[in-house]
Structures are given as structure tokens and as C-alpha cells.
From Swiss-Prot:
Region called Catalytic subdomain B, residue ranges: 301-363
Sites carrying sugar chains: 87
Cystine crosslinks: 124-355, 346-422
Cytoplasmic compartment residues: 1-4
Family in the record: Belongs to the glycosyltransferase 2 family. GalNAc-T subfamily.
Topology in membrane: Single-pass type II membrane protein
Transmembrane segments: 5-27
Domain comment (free text): There are two conserved domains in the glycosyltransferase region: the N-terminal domain (domain A, also called GT1 motif), which is probably involved in manganese coordination and substrate binding and the C-terminal domain (domain B, also called Gal/GalNAc-T motif), which is probably involved in catalytic reaction and UDP-Gal binding.
The protein's name: Inactive polypeptide N-acetylgalactosaminyltransferase-like protein 5
Top-rank taxon, per record: Eukaryota
Length: 443
């Protein structure tokens, strides 16, 4: 009897101990899971009354990924990545190439979302960005853009941009004539959950004034201008916002990867900087090796004499302060160089941020309409007469036929230059782009 009692007490204690241990494990697991869930929630950017010391790290496992990936066959992947499907005798393909400047057939087969290779340096994966950064308004202007390409641009932005940094996407339709960009576009914008505003111009304004219209409707701290046929890459926005947060007068561009116009293959860009020649033709130049010296290596921001203009970020108040775009320039062309000179000569800085990557379709040029050629000439001359000082003669030596062409009233822009206390073009050559002065005698 006594043995039975002792045995019962022993097994009872053992059972109690087991249940106690299981209860402890259960409670501990719930506590850890709850803490992990909370710790993964991003801190609201610029939220009032919060002191933020925590940093968000975007490594290879923490990069936001598209919520839907279009499934494709191996054949489709081969077509898009290797370009093996390009049929030079396909009349439909040539018709679309002439209309849109790139291979629309492959674009449509990809759907509106796809994964692109992460082309950043491995050192970029170790970069830390604060949880508290400025918010961004993305401005995308379009005119008769292929509908799927526009959706690919918007989808890549919404899928690969943290929602707490994305204030809004502002679409500016510059009076497109394509039916798909009317009711169909309005219908599909519902999928972007209210983050997208669309402005429809009542007359054709051209890219420059369309961007000014978009910027006037923005409410984010930073304006990010994107072309309507690009795809942003992973962790593309944070490096741009971080640079601007450190220096409000810094204007920044991503490193622009190439999306082939015929195969839509996404190709990484080498480290480059934007420059131009005395014909005012923009071009990409290699970066000097000594500029990449130091602990940051290939992730170091690249000092750039000029920007290509299609994709860049600038603090909204600074954009207004330095005079936005020259609103009397027409359509597009050379507004990028005018803004680049103004940034450098009027107290700002222009950098390319290698850890930010955006792919851009290099559309096939099939000849410019006479209206665009006329607009570019007009824009050339406004830039030359406002910003080049005595060096404008270098331009006219190469383009003598433009010396007596009219270019409108530039008084407002000349007064802006005086009001901002801008430096001379000689200063720009001495301090920003000495290689251009060295080429003075090369015609």
C-alpha cells in the first residue's frame, strides 16, 4: 500500500512537471513570436513625436518583393532574356517597333510584373538606411506610351518601394491619343489602392511642362521623376532619399541599367557619369578609378557634371527654390543640361548613386518629327545664352547656322541666375568639368 502511494505521488509530480514545462514553452514561444512580429513592422517615416534611433537593414533576405509574379514558361523566359525570338521578317514586330520604339510583343508576353536581376554591388547589400527618411512623390509623364510598359513601370515602383516612403505616384497624361490609355487605364488604376493620381492635360504640353504640372500637384518631401518605360530594381529609393536627407541641395540619379529595346533583356550598367561635349550632346563617360578609392569602393556616390534627365530625385522645396525647369523650353531636349548647369553653378551638387538601380528601355529612334527638332534647337539656344557666358562661342563654332536663330525672351531666367547668386561657367569648367575646357580646340 505504502509503495502504491509513493508511486502515485511520483507519477503525479512527474505529470505536473511535464505540463508545467509544456506551458512554459508555449508561453515563451508566443512571446517571442509576438516580439518578432512587432520588430518587423517598419517605423512610420517622419511620424510626429517619435524619436527614431533604429535602422532598417535591407539585406538580401529583407528586400521587398513583388506580391504577384507572372508565371511564364521556359520558352517565354528564353525569349525575354536571350532575345532568341527576334524575327527580323515579322511585319507585326516592325510595325510595333516603328510605333513604340521597342519590342511590344515581348513586353506584353511578360505581363506587368517580372523579376529582374539584382545588379547592385554586393557591398550595397551591407548598406544601412534610417527608418526615418523623406517621403517621395513619383512623377511619371507619358504621351502615347505603350500601356503595358506604363503598367510595368508603376508595378515595379509599388512592389519594390516601402509604402511608408511612397507618398504617391502622379501620372501626367500629355493628351495621349491611344485608346488603352483612357478608360482602360482608369479602370486598372484601381489595383494600385489609391496611391496613384492621374492628371490629364487638355492640350499637348511636352515633357518639360508636363513635369512641371505633375510637380505642382505633389505633396511628398522629394520629387522623383521617372520615364514611363522603366523598371526599378531592389532597394532603389532608399539610397536616393538618404543622400538627399543628408544634403538638401544634393540632386541624385540612380545608376541606369539598360533594358534592350528588342529583347527586353535587363542588362547591368557599369559605373559611369554624365557629361556632354561642345555640341551640347549628352553622353556617358567612365568613372575615374581614383574616384572609387576609399572604404566605400564601388558604392561611393559618383560626382556627375550632368544628368541624362529621365530619372532623378530632388527635394521638392529645392526644386522650386532653384527655378524648376525653364517653362519656356519646348517639348523635351537639353532641359537636362540646363538643370545640371544650374544645380552646380547655383550652389547645389549632382551625384549618381550606384546602390540605386533603375532599368530603362533604350527606345529605337526612328527619326524625330520636325516639331521636336525645332524644339530642341530652341532649347539649345536658351541654355547657351543664359549659362555659357563667353563660352557660347565654342557652341556656335560648331553650329554656326544657329547663331542668329531666335530663342524667345530669356530675361526671367537671366534674373533668376542673378537672384540665386550663381557662379560663372568658367567656375564650372575649373571645378566640375575641366575635361570640357581641355577639348576647346577639338572641332
Amino acid at each position: 500500500m505504502r509503495n502504491a502511494i509513493i508511486q502515485g505521488l511520483f507519477y503525479g509530480s512527474l505529470t505536473f512537471g511535464i505540463w508545467t514545462a509544456l506551458l512554459f514553452i508555449y508561453l515563451h514561444h508566443n512571446h517571442v513570436s509576438s516580439w518578432q512580429k512587432k520588430s518587423q513592422e517598419p517605423l512610420s517615416a517622419w511620424s510626429p513625436g517619435k524619436k527614431v534611433h533604429q535602422q532598417i537593414i535591407y539585406g538580401s533576405e529583407q528586400i521587398p518583393k513583388p506580391h504577384v509574379i507572372v508565371k511564364r514558361t521556359d520558352e517565354d523566359k528564353a525569349k525575354s532574356m536571350l532575345g532568341t525570338d527576334f524575327n527580323h521578317t515579322n511585319p507585326e514586330l516592325h510595325k510595333e517597333l516603328l510605333k513604340y520604339g521597342f519590342n511590344v510583343i515581348i513586353s506584353r508576353s511578360l505581363g506587368i510584373e517580372r523579376e529582374v536581376p539584382d545588379t547592385r554591388s554586393k557591398m550595397c547589400l551591407q548598406k544601412h538606411y534610417p527608418a526615418r527618411l523623406p517621403t517621395a512623390s513619383i512623377v511619371i509623364c507619358f504621351y502615347n506610351e505603350e500601356c503595358n510598359a506604363l503598367f510595368q513601370t508603376m508595378s515595379s515602383v509599388t512592389n519594390l518601394t516601402p509604402h511608408y516612403f511612397l507618398e504617391e505616384i502622379i501620372l501626367v497624361d500629355d493628351m495621349s491619343k491611344v485608346d488603352d490609355l483612357k478608360e482602360k487605364l482608369d479602370y486598372h488604376l484601381e489595383t494600385f489602392r489609391g496611391k496613384v493620381k492621374i492628371i490629364r492635360n487638355k492640350k499637348r504640353e511636352g515633357l518639360i511642362r508636363a513635369r512641371l504640372i505633375g510637380a505642382s500637384h505633389a505633396s511628398g518631401d522629394v520629387l522623383v521623376f521617372l520615364d514611363s518605360h522603366c523598371e526599378v530594381n531592389r532597394v532603389w529609393l532608399e539610397p536616393l532619399l538618404h543622400a538627399i536627407a543628408k544634403d538638401p541641395k544634393m540632386v541624385v540619379c540612380p545608376l541606369i541599367d539598360v533594358i534592350d529595346d528588342r529583347t527586353l533583356e535587363y542588362k547591368p550598367s557599369p559605373l559611369v557619369r554624365g557629361t556632354f561635349d561642345w555640341n551640347l550632346q549628352f553622353k556617358w563617360d567612365n568613372v575615374f578609378s581614383y574616384e572609387m578609392d576609399g572604404p566605400e569602393g564601388s558604392t561611393k556616390p559618383i560626382r556627375s557634371p550632368a544628368m541624362s534627365g529621365g530619372i532623378f530625385a530632388i527635394r521638392r522645396h529645392y526644386f522650386n527654390e532653384i527655378g524648376q525647369y525653364d517653362k519656356d523650353m519646348d517639348f523635351w531636349g537639353r532641359e537636362n543640361l540646363e538643370l545640371s548647369l544650374r544645380i552646380w553653378m547655383c550652389g547645389g551638387q549632382l551625384f549618381i548613386i550606384p546602390c540605386s538601380r533603375v532599368g530603362h528601355i533604350s527606345k529605337k529612334q526612328t527619326g524625330k518629327p520636325s516639331t521636336i527638332i525645332s524644339a530642341m534647337t530652341h532649347n539649345y539656344l536658351r541654355l547657351v545664352h543664359v549659362w555659357l557666358d563667353e563660352y557660347k562661342e565654342q557652341f556656335f563654332l560648331r553650329k554656326p547656322g544657329l547663331k542668329y536663330v531666335t530663342y524667345g525672351n530669356i530675361r526671367e531666367r537671366v534674373e533668376l541666375r542673378k537672384r540665386l547668386g550663381c557662379k560663372s561657367f568658367q567656375w564650372y569648367l575649373d571645378n566640375v568639368f575641366p575635361e570640357l575646357e581641355a577639348s576647346v580646340n577639338s572641332l
